[in-house]
A protein has these predicted regions:
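Short beta-strand scaffold segments in enzyme catalytic cores
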Residues: 76-78, 90-93, 126, 207-209, ...
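A conserved C-terminal secondary-structure "cap"
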Residues: 237-254
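Generic N-terminal amphipathic, Lys/Arg-enriched alpha-helix
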Residues: 1-8
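CN hydrolase (nitrilase-like) catalytic-core segments centered on the catalytic cysteine
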Residues: 55-75, 144-227
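Active-site catalytic loop in hydrolytic enzyme cores
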Residues: 82-158, 163, 167-176, 203, ...
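Short beta->alpha transition motifs characteristic of CBS
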Residues: 41, 48, 92, 104-110, ...
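Short, acidic/polar
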Residues: 13-22, 144-150
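Cys-nucleophile CN-hydrolase/nitrilase-fold catalytic domain and related Cys-dependent amidase chemistry
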Residues: 11-12, 19-97, 103, 166-187
Length: 254
């Protein structure tokens, strides 16, 4: 888990920091690396059209090279992605072969941080096969919408990745929602938040891994750090068998 501070609008500085922290994780044996939301720019939304990258841009190029060099899977947080017309808050998954395996455009844009003024929303959920098993991907504000993780769990998701830029003022929500999503959907949650501050917000950090029983297996501080966690994803099946909510649910009554 790459819990990093982000220099607002300074892509080169953020790329250098992300690379150093990824390499530190690899030295500690990481096979899967997760970055925070908008890790290469931060919420520099007034300049986001100038900062946005195509898929062949330098930020993803760096991550593709690192994934292949170290034989790791990277859940590449998110970056501002342009298709030439629109700009999206887009998370990518880069495989051990250095290729883009999937991407997810953030569905729920948060008005409190003016995303809806500068970005376009996505309209498709994201499920993929990960080294962590069947996985899903949401971004930050999406965490508040219970329907999306539930639909993903019903479709087979067993690990939910949540890159974020979550402010300290709502820090209690961050912890509570990550644990709740893990318990109610009986899946692992791997949530990576930034630290530091921008012009308007202090960011909470506390990146975490939560198991399907709601136990927090690891939790970061409010400082920059690389958090390496050994997770037995296969243990999720035993946890799910204890309280078989998906067997017992009665959606026809809801």
């Amino acid at each position: 888990l790459v819990q990093m501070d982000i220099v607002l609008g300074n892509v080169a500085a953020n790329q250098a920091k992300a690379q150093a922290m990824i390499e530190e994780g690899c030295r500690q044996g990481a096979r899967l690396v997760v970055l925070p939301e908008l890790w290469n720019t931060g919420y520099q939304l007034q300049e986001i059209r100038n900062l946005a990258e195509y898929e062949d841009g330098s930020s993803l190029g760096m991550l593709k090279r690192l994934a292949q060099e170290y034989c790791i899977e990277i859940v590449a947080g998110s970056i501002a992605e342009t298709d030439g017309t629109h700009v999206y808050n887009t998370a990518y998954v880069i495989g051990q072969d250095g290729g883009i395996h999937t991407k997810y455009r953030k569905i729920h844009l948060i008005g409190l941080m003016a995303e809806d003024r500068y970005l376009s929303p996505g309209n498709r959920r994201c499920l993929f096969d990960s080294v962590a098993g069947p996985a899903g991907l949401i971004i930050c504000y999406d965490l508040r919408f219970t329907e999306l993780p539930r639909a993903m769990a019903l479709a087979g998701c067993r690990t939910l990745f949540v890159p974020a830029e979550w402010p300290s003022v709502r820090g209690r929500h961050w912890v509570t929602l990550n644990v709740a999503r893990a318990i109610e959907n009986q899946l692992f949650v791997i949530a990576v938040n930034r630290v530091g501050k921008d012009l308007d917000n202090d960011f909470y950090g506390h990146s975490m891994v939560v198991d399907p029983w709601g136990e927090v297996l690891a939790e970061g501080s409010e400082k920059e750090e690389v958090i390496v966690v050994d997770v037995n994803f296969a243990a999720g099946e035993e946890i799910r068998s204890r309280i078989p909510v998906f067997r017992d649910r009665r959606p026809e009554c809801y």
